[in-house]
Design a protein with these regions (language model features):
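Catalytic cores of Mg2+-dependent Asp-rich isoprenoid enzymes
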Residues: 1-194, 199, 203-331
Length: 331
Protein backbone atom coordinates (compact mmCIF):
# COMPACT_ATOMS: atom_id res chain seq x y z
CA UNK A 1 0.00 0.00 0.00
CA UNK A 2 1.36 3.40 -0.93
CA UNK A 3 1.04 5.79 1.99
CA UNK A 4 -0.11 9.03 0.40
CA UNK A 5 -3.67 10.19 0.81
CA UNK A 6 -3.62 13.21 -1.43
CA UNK A 7 -6.28 13.31 -4.11
CA UNK A 8 -6.21 15.33 -7.31
CA UNK A 9 -5.92 19.01 -6.45
CA UNK A 10 -8.58 19.96 -8.98
CA UNK A 11 -11.14 17.81 -7.14
CA UNK A 12 -10.78 19.73 -3.87
CA UNK A 13 -13.52 22.22 -3.00
CA UNK A 14 -12.04 25.75 -2.73
CA UNK A 15 -11.96 26.97 0.88
CA UNK A 16 -10.74 30.57 1.35
CA UNK A 17 -10.06 30.11 5.08
CA UNK A 18 -8.05 26.95 4.43
CA UNK A 19 -6.11 28.62 1.61
CA UNK A 20 -5.30 31.55 3.90
CA UNK A 21 -4.19 29.14 6.64
CA UNK A 22 -1.81 27.35 4.29
CA UNK A 23 -0.50 30.71 3.09
CA UNK A 24 0.30 31.68 6.68
CA UNK A 25 2.19 28.41 7.19
CA UNK A 26 4.11 28.97 3.97
CA UNK A 27 5.10 32.45 5.14
CA UNK A 28 6.35 31.01 8.44
CA UNK A 29 8.41 28.40 6.59
CA UNK A 30 9.82 30.95 4.16
CA UNK A 31 10.80 33.27 7.00
CA UNK A 32 12.28 30.73 9.39
CA UNK A 33 12.94 27.37 7.75
CA UNK A 34 16.18 28.39 6.01
CA UNK A 35 17.55 25.06 4.67
CA UNK A 36 14.19 23.30 4.73
CA UNK A 37 12.29 25.87 2.68
CA UNK A 38 14.47 25.49 -0.40
CA UNK A 39 13.67 21.79 -0.43
CA UNK A 40 9.97 22.48 0.03
CA UNK A 41 9.97 24.46 -3.22
CA UNK A 42 10.75 21.30 -5.17
CA UNK A 43 7.53 19.60 -4.01
CA UNK A 44 4.17 19.59 -5.81
CA UNK A 45 1.96 22.27 -4.24
CA UNK A 46 -0.35 19.96 -2.22
CA UNK A 47 2.63 18.26 -0.61
CA UNK A 48 4.48 21.56 -0.19
CA UNK A 49 1.47 23.06 1.61
CA UNK A 50 1.27 20.06 3.95
CA UNK A 51 4.99 20.15 4.75
CA UNK A 52 4.78 23.88 5.50
CA UNK A 53 1.86 23.22 7.87
CA UNK A 54 3.92 20.59 9.72
CA UNK A 55 6.89 22.96 9.89
CA UNK A 56 4.76 25.82 11.25
CA UNK A 57 3.37 23.46 13.92
CA UNK A 58 6.89 22.40 14.93
CA UNK A 59 8.10 26.01 14.92
CA UNK A 60 5.36 27.13 17.29
CA UNK A 61 6.08 24.25 19.69
CA UNK A 62 9.78 25.17 19.64
CA UNK A 63 9.00 28.83 20.28
CA UNK A 64 6.95 27.95 23.35
CA UNK A 65 9.64 25.68 24.81
CA UNK A 66 12.41 28.21 24.03
CA UNK A 67 10.67 31.26 25.53
CA UNK A 68 13.22 32.20 28.18
CA UNK A 69 11.00 35.00 29.50
CA UNK A 70 8.97 32.18 31.09
CA UNK A 71 10.08 29.66 33.69
CA UNK A 72 10.43 26.04 32.64
CA UNK A 73 7.28 25.15 34.55
CA UNK A 74 5.37 27.94 32.84
CA UNK A 75 6.62 26.86 29.42
CA UNK A 76 5.57 23.29 30.07
CA UNK A 77 2.11 24.49 31.12
CA UNK A 78 1.92 26.71 28.02
CA UNK A 79 2.88 23.77 25.84
CA UNK A 80 0.29 21.51 27.45
CA UNK A 81 -2.45 24.11 26.93
CA UNK A 82 -1.41 24.60 23.31
CA UNK A 83 -1.45 20.85 22.64
CA UNK A 84 -4.91 20.58 24.20
CA UNK A 85 -6.12 23.31 21.83
CA UNK A 86 -4.57 21.44 18.91
CA UNK A 87 -6.28 18.18 19.89
CA UNK A 88 -9.63 19.95 19.98
CA UNK A 89 -9.02 21.45 16.55
CA UNK A 90 -7.93 18.09 15.14
CA UNK A 91 -11.14 16.56 16.49
CA UNK A 92 -13.19 19.08 14.53
CA UNK A 93 -13.64 22.00 16.93
CA UNK A 94 -13.65 25.44 15.33
CA UNK A 95 -10.37 27.32 15.76
CA UNK A 96 -9.01 30.69 14.65
CA UNK A 97 -5.44 29.32 14.60
CA UNK A 98 -4.28 29.11 10.95
CA UNK A 99 -1.61 26.53 11.80
CA UNK A 100 -4.19 24.23 13.38
CA UNK A 101 -6.57 24.73 10.44
CA UNK A 102 -3.90 23.83 7.88
CA UNK A 103 -2.42 20.94 9.85
CA UNK A 104 -5.82 19.38 10.55
CA UNK A 105 -6.47 19.36 6.81
CA UNK A 106 -2.99 18.01 5.97
CA UNK A 107 -3.31 15.29 8.61
CA UNK A 108 -6.51 14.00 7.02
CA UNK A 109 -5.28 14.26 3.45
CA UNK A 110 -2.04 12.41 4.08
CA UNK A 111 -3.12 10.04 6.88
CA UNK A 112 -0.61 11.43 9.38
CA UNK A 113 -1.06 9.60 12.72
CA UNK A 114 -1.88 11.90 15.62
CA UNK A 115 0.66 9.98 17.69
CA UNK A 116 3.51 11.18 15.48
CA UNK A 117 2.47 14.81 15.91
CA UNK A 118 2.26 14.30 19.67
CA UNK A 119 5.77 12.86 19.61
CA UNK A 120 7.00 15.99 17.82
CA UNK A 121 5.76 18.09 20.73
CA UNK A 122 7.23 15.63 23.24
CA UNK A 123 10.61 16.22 21.61
CA UNK A 124 10.44 19.97 22.17
CA UNK A 125 9.38 19.39 25.79
CA UNK A 126 12.55 17.34 26.38
CA UNK A 127 14.51 20.60 26.28
CA UNK A 128 12.66 21.67 29.43
CA UNK A 129 14.27 18.91 31.54
CA UNK A 130 17.37 19.72 33.60
CA UNK A 131 19.54 16.62 33.52
CA UNK A 132 22.79 17.66 35.21
CA UNK A 133 23.63 19.74 38.26
CA UNK A 134 27.23 20.81 37.71
CA UNK A 135 28.11 20.98 41.38
CA UNK A 136 26.74 17.51 41.95
CA UNK A 137 28.64 16.15 38.96
CA UNK A 138 31.94 17.98 39.26
CA UNK A 139 32.05 19.37 42.78
CA UNK A 140 32.19 23.06 43.69
CA UNK A 141 32.85 25.19 40.63
CA UNK A 142 32.69 28.87 39.87
CA UNK A 143 29.30 29.86 38.45
CA UNK A 144 28.09 26.26 38.66
CA UNK A 145 24.73 25.85 36.97
CA UNK A 146 22.23 23.21 35.88
CA UNK A 147 22.75 21.87 32.36
CA UNK A 148 20.59 20.10 29.82
CA UNK A 149 22.77 17.14 28.85
CA UNK A 150 22.71 13.54 27.66
CA UNK A 151 24.85 10.94 29.38
CA UNK A 152 25.39 8.61 26.42
CA UNK A 153 25.05 8.70 22.66
CA UNK A 154 22.12 6.32 22.98
CA UNK A 155 20.39 8.92 25.17
CA UNK A 156 21.14 11.57 22.56
CA UNK A 157 19.89 9.33 19.76
CA UNK A 158 16.61 8.93 21.63
CA UNK A 159 16.32 12.73 21.81
CA UNK A 160 17.11 12.94 18.08
CA UNK A 161 14.34 10.44 17.41
CA UNK A 162 11.70 12.69 18.97
CA UNK A 163 12.89 16.00 17.54
CA UNK A 164 14.06 14.84 14.10
CA UNK A 165 13.34 11.19 13.23
CA UNK A 166 9.64 11.72 13.92
CA UNK A 167 9.76 14.64 11.49
CA UNK A 168 11.11 12.23 8.89
CA UNK A 169 8.30 9.77 9.60
CA UNK A 170 5.73 12.54 9.12
CA UNK A 171 7.42 13.75 5.94
CA UNK A 172 7.46 10.38 4.20
CA UNK A 173 3.73 10.09 4.75
CA UNK A 174 3.38 13.32 2.83
CA UNK A 175 5.97 12.30 0.24
CA UNK A 176 4.32 8.91 -0.29
CA UNK A 177 5.99 5.50 0.00
CA UNK A 178 5.18 1.80 -0.21
CA UNK A 179 8.33 0.00 0.97
CA UNK A 180 8.32 -0.44 4.79
CA UNK A 181 12.11 0.00 4.81
CA UNK A 182 11.47 3.70 4.24
CA UNK A 183 10.50 4.21 7.88
CA UNK A 184 13.87 3.20 9.38
CA UNK A 185 15.72 5.13 6.69
CA UNK A 186 13.60 8.23 7.39
CA UNK A 187 14.53 7.92 11.06
CA UNK A 188 18.23 7.74 10.16
CA UNK A 189 17.95 10.78 7.90
CA UNK A 190 16.41 12.76 10.75
CA UNK A 191 19.26 11.77 13.08
CA UNK A 192 21.81 12.88 10.46
CA UNK A 193 20.15 16.30 10.22
CA UNK A 194 19.90 16.74 13.99
CA UNK A 195 23.52 15.76 14.63
CA UNK A 196 24.50 18.35 12.01
CA UNK A 197 22.39 20.96 13.82
CA UNK A 198 23.99 20.02 17.13
CA UNK A 199 27.48 20.48 15.71
CA UNK A 200 26.59 23.82 14.14
CA UNK A 201 24.98 25.14 17.33
CA UNK A 202 27.45 23.98 20.01
CA UNK A 203 28.31 27.51 21.11
CA UNK A 204 24.75 28.87 20.90
CA UNK A 205 23.33 25.91 22.83
CA UNK A 206 26.05 26.10 25.49
CA UNK A 207 25.22 29.75 26.10
CA UNK A 208 21.64 28.63 26.82
CA UNK A 209 22.73 25.88 29.21
CA UNK A 210 22.38 23.02 26.74
CA UNK A 211 25.18 20.59 25.93
CA UNK A 212 23.99 17.96 23.49
CA UNK A 213 27.40 16.32 23.05
CA UNK A 214 27.17 13.12 25.15
CA UNK A 215 28.86 13.33 28.53
CA UNK A 216 30.55 9.98 27.86
CA UNK A 217 32.21 11.57 24.81
CA UNK A 218 33.32 14.62 26.80
CA UNK A 219 34.83 12.34 29.44
CA UNK A 220 36.54 10.18 26.81
CA UNK A 221 38.21 13.24 25.27
CA UNK A 222 38.84 14.95 28.63
CA UNK A 223 36.79 18.01 27.67
CA UNK A 224 34.85 19.86 30.38
CA UNK A 225 31.43 21.42 29.82
CA UNK A 226 32.76 24.83 30.86
CA UNK A 227 35.29 24.74 28.02
CA UNK A 228 32.46 24.64 25.50
CA UNK A 229 30.44 27.25 27.37
CA UNK A 230 33.27 29.81 27.40
CA UNK A 231 34.93 29.10 24.05
CA UNK A 232 34.37 31.99 21.62
CA UNK A 233 37.30 31.54 19.25
CA UNK A 234 37.42 28.16 17.58
CA UNK A 235 40.54 28.88 15.57
CA UNK A 236 42.67 27.42 18.36
CA UNK A 237 40.78 24.31 19.38
CA UNK A 238 42.75 21.79 21.37
CA UNK A 239 43.27 18.36 19.86
CA UNK A 240 40.83 16.88 22.37
CA UNK A 241 38.15 19.44 21.54
CA UNK A 242 38.53 18.90 17.80
CA UNK A 243 38.44 15.10 18.14
CA UNK A 244 35.30 15.39 20.28
CA UNK A 245 33.48 17.29 17.52
CA UNK A 246 34.96 15.11 14.79
CA UNK A 247 33.56 12.02 16.50
CA UNK A 248 30.02 13.38 16.31
CA UNK A 249 30.56 14.36 12.67
CA UNK A 250 31.60 10.79 11.83
CA UNK A 251 28.43 9.50 13.43
CA UNK A 252 26.42 11.97 11.35
CA UNK A 253 28.17 10.76 8.18
CA UNK A 254 27.14 7.19 8.99
CA UNK A 255 23.51 8.26 9.29
CA UNK A 256 23.69 10.21 6.03
CA UNK A 257 24.98 7.08 4.29
CA UNK A 258 22.01 5.12 5.59
CA UNK A 259 19.56 7.91 4.86
CA UNK A 260 20.57 8.18 1.18
CA UNK A 261 18.96 4.81 0.60
CA UNK A 262 15.59 6.45 1.31
CA UNK A 263 15.52 8.45 -1.93
CA UNK A 264 14.36 5.69 -4.34
CA UNK A 265 11.74 4.45 -1.86
CA UNK A 266 9.53 7.56 -1.86
CA UNK A 267 7.15 8.75 -4.57
CA UNK A 268 8.98 10.09 -7.65
CA UNK A 269 7.40 13.55 -7.39
CA UNK A 270 8.93 14.02 -3.92
CA UNK A 271 12.43 12.70 -4.65
CA UNK A 272 13.89 16.00 -5.90
CA UNK A 273 12.80 17.75 -2.69
CA UNK A 274 14.39 15.09 -0.49
CA UNK A 275 17.53 15.21 -2.61
CA UNK A 276 17.72 19.00 -2.18
CA UNK A 277 17.25 18.73 1.58
CA UNK A 278 19.83 15.99 2.10
CA UNK A 279 22.32 17.76 -0.18
CA UNK A 280 22.00 21.11 1.62
CA UNK A 281 22.31 19.55 5.07
CA UNK A 282 25.25 17.37 4.09
CA UNK A 283 26.93 20.41 2.54
CA UNK A 284 26.54 22.15 5.92
CA UNK A 285 28.29 19.26 7.66
CA UNK A 286 31.11 19.36 5.12
CA UNK A 287 31.56 23.11 5.66
CA UNK A 288 31.89 22.50 9.40
CA UNK A 289 34.50 19.82 8.73
CA UNK A 290 36.44 22.05 6.32
CA UNK A 291 36.55 24.80 8.94
CA UNK A 292 38.35 22.43 11.30
CA UNK A 293 35.19 22.26 13.44
CA UNK A 294 35.38 25.94 14.33
CA UNK A 295 31.71 26.44 15.19
CA UNK A 296 32.57 28.99 17.87
CA UNK A 297 33.90 32.03 16.00
CA UNK A 298 30.73 32.42 13.94
CA UNK A 299 27.67 30.43 12.96
CA UNK A 300 28.41 28.16 10.01
CA UNK A 301 25.84 28.15 7.22
CA UNK A 302 25.43 27.18 3.59
CA UNK A 303 25.58 30.35 1.45
CA UNK A 304 22.39 31.45 -0.27
CA UNK A 305 24.00 31.07 -3.69
CA UNK A 306 24.87 27.46 -2.91
CA UNK A 307 21.35 26.71 -1.67
CA UNK A 308 19.87 28.25 -4.81
CA UNK A 309 22.26 26.24 -6.97
CA UNK A 310 21.23 23.01 -5.23
CA UNK A 311 17.56 23.95 -5.62
CA UNK A 312 18.09 24.59 -9.33
CA UNK A 313 19.62 21.15 -9.71
CA UNK A 314 16.61 19.72 -7.89
CA UNK A 315 14.21 21.53 -10.23
CA UNK A 316 16.15 20.18 -13.21
CA UNK A 317 15.59 16.70 -11.78
CA UNK A 318 11.85 17.41 -11.74
CA UNK A 319 11.92 18.51 -15.39
CA UNK A 320 13.98 15.46 -16.35
CA UNK A 321 11.56 13.14 -14.55
CA UNK A 322 8.61 14.72 -16.34
CA UNK A 323 10.28 14.48 -19.73
CA UNK A 324 11.32 10.87 -19.28
CA UNK A 325 7.88 10.02 -17.92
CA UNK A 326 6.20 11.59 -20.93
CA UNK A 327 8.57 9.78 -23.27
CA UNK A 328 7.75 6.48 -21.58
CA UNK A 329 4.03 7.05 -22.03
CA UNK A 330 4.46 7.59 -25.77
CA UNK A 331 6.88 4.73 -26.31
Amino acid sequence: MTLSADGPEQNRVPNPQLAAAYKTCTQIARRQAKNFYYAFLALPKPKRDAICAVYAFMRHADDISDDESRTRAQRRADLDAWVDAWHRAAAGARTPDPVFIALADARQRFAIPMDLLDQLVHGTAMDLDVTLDEKAAYGEAQEARPWDTYATFEDLRRYCYYVASVVGLVCIRIFGYSDPRAEKLAEDTGVAFQLTNILRDVREDAERGRIYLPLEDLDRHNVHIQELATLHDGSHLTLNQRELLEGLAKRAEDYYASGRQLLPLISPDARPALWVLVTIYHRLLRRIERRGFDVFSERVSVPLTTRLSILLRGLIRILFNRLTGAAGQHA
